[in-house]
Amino acid sequence: RFAHDPMAGGHRMWQMAGLKAQRAQTDVNNKQAAFDAAAKEKADADAALSTAMESRKKKEDNKRDAEGKLNDELAKNKGKIPGLKIDQKIRGQMPERGWTEDDIKNTVSNGATGTSFDKRSPKKTPPDYLGRNDPATVYGSPGKYVVVNDRTGEVTQISDKTDPGWVDDSRIQWGNKNDQ
């Protein structure tokens, strides 16, 4: 009467198979959730990349437009002399350094050849006696140059064309200003 019930073993097998199937389904569900999360993360990253690329393209287009406008202005103003202001100190140096006002205008009209800075102290900037801390443009060539303050148009320095040993101002960076 207490003999082994063959159905009891079969039921247990089915029960074990059901548990394995349940675990497998849970595993599949977890992996699907992880896959869905990764897919959403990828979609978000793709959207961010697309936005960044659009932003970069707009900035590059704006830069290209600005460079085009700058080049148009440069072409339009090529050979034109900026409103030069020559103070008494520079006028006093001109004859002894081999310069005339026409020499200065001609040198400037040939175009920029470098950059510098105007860092004159207040006592060296009559009539306003306000110190300067401005970018400046260099015209000419080493040993034969004119430096003009970009903001004020003042000629801030002329080299000594008569002195073959003239040492250029250390603030001068030679090279076409528009190529930098």
From Swiss-Prot:
Record field: compositional bias (Polar residues): 106-116
Source taxon at top rank: Bacteria
Listed name of the protein: Colicin-E5
EC number: 3.1.-.-
Enzyme class: hydrolase
Transmembrane segments: none
One GO molecular-function entry: endonuclease activity
Species assigned in the record: Escherichia coli
Keyword Hydrolase belongs to the record: yes
